[in-house]
């Protein structure tokens, strides 16, 4: 079986790197992009993604916007999406979970969060 492939979406380089490195330590292939638009373009051309881990707060479009685009697409709706954010706002968390996110993890994402993320692959 090949390694799972996770798309990491975050506008902050450090956060993208931390999440990517944590996942790669668990033999996960990672593609990291810095915007929702880049993520959507990648998903349109790439079909072997097993999961998306996305920041919530990004310029132009949020992680919630990405979640909605994924869930309304027949070819992507099956993908698990985990939202990561430094904002512990109950209404936002509920909105993401009600919208179909598998989980909402508070940043900074830590090594101990990886098994929590991996269980959705």
Swiss-Prot record:
It comes from Oryza sativa subsp. indica (Rice). Functions as a response regulator involved in His-to-Asp phosphorelay signal transduction system. Phosphorylation of the Asp residue in the receiver domain activates the ability of the protein to promote the transcription of target genes. Type-A response regulators seem to act as negative regulators of the cytokinin signaling. Residues 5-121 form the Response regulatory domain. GO terms for biological process: cytokinin-activated signaling pathway; phosphorelay signal transduction system; response to cytokinin. It holds the Pfam family Response_reg. This is Two-component response regulator ORR8. Two-component system major event consists of a His-to-Asp phosphorelay between a sensor histidine kinase (HK) and a response regulator (RR). In plants, the His-to-Asp phosphorelay involves an additional intermediate named Histidine-containing phosphotransfer protein (HPt). This multistep phosphorelay consists of a His-Asp-His-Asp sequential transfer of a phosphate group between first a His and an Asp of the HK protein, followed by the transfer to a conserved His of the HPt protein and finally the transfer to an Asp in the receiver domain of the RR protein. Keywords: Cytokinin signaling pathway, Phosphoprotein, Transcription, Transcription regulation, Two-component regulatory system. Expressed in mature leaves, and at low levels in roots, shoots and flowers. The keyword Phosphoprotein applies. Belongs to the ARR family. Type-A subfamily. The modification 4-aspartylphosphate is found at residue 55. Induction: Not induced by cytokinin. SMART domains: REC.
